[in-house]
């Protein structure tokens, strides 16, 4: 299915229990990192802590290469390779804790994200959308400007432990404004 559609949902890529542990860890990390930054224990540019200044989704908590998320990447590589039929090389993990009002504008990924994944850890439901045509519809990503008549895309709904794997450089993907309280991916 992946080779034909360039995306595939993997239900139960990790257990619900492990997803819940990772989601709670993400929440605690966001609270701790926010406290450390606000109390001058560390600074926003410290690569060992996450931040709330993500350019792509301002206001969300984001962290590059978190140790637990790296472990989840390693843990899921076998199932990703099996489902895609590709030999994959893990490059990095990037995690976000989304908050009410966050938007992930329609975009394609950079080359290091050739094969991308989003793993639902927990929180309120928030679908991700993909345009399976592979067309270029984005005029200005950070302003959310797309071409008139752009396809509405395929809605993908994930539950904790479910994973979407997709060709990030080929397929535009996005999320509409988040109406829930928190969502960890």
Model-derived features with residue positions:
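Short, active-site-adjacent segments that bind or coordinate small-molecule cofactors and metal centers
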Residues: 54-58, 174, 184-185
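Generic beta-strand or strand-like secondary-structure segments
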Residues: 75-79, 94, 116
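A short coil-to-beta-strand element that immediately follows conserved catalytic motifs
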Residues: 85-94
């Amino acid at each position: 299915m992946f080779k034909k559609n360039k995306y595939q949902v993997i239900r139960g890529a990790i257990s619900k229990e492990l997803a819940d542990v990772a989601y709670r860890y993400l929440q605690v990390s966001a609270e701790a990192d926010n406290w450390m930054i606000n109390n001058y224990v560390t600074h926003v540019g410290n690569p060992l802590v996450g931040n709330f200044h993500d350019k792509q989704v301002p206001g969300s908590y984001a962290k590059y290469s978190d140790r637990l998320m790296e472990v989840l990447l390693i843990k899921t590589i076998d199932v990703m390779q099996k489902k895609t039929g590709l030999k994959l090389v893990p490059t990095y993990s990037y995690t976000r804790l989304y908050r009410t009002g966050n938007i992930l504008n329609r975009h394609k990924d950079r080359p290091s994200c050739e094969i991308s994944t989003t793993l639902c850890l927990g929180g309120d439901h928030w679908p991700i959308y993909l345009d399976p045509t592979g067309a270029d519809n984005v005029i200005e990503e950070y302003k959310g400007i797309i071409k008139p008549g752009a396809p509405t895309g395929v809605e993908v709904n994930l539950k904790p432990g479910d994973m979407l794997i997709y060709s990030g450089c080929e397929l535009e993907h996005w999320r509409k404004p988040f109406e829930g309280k928190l969502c960890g991916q």
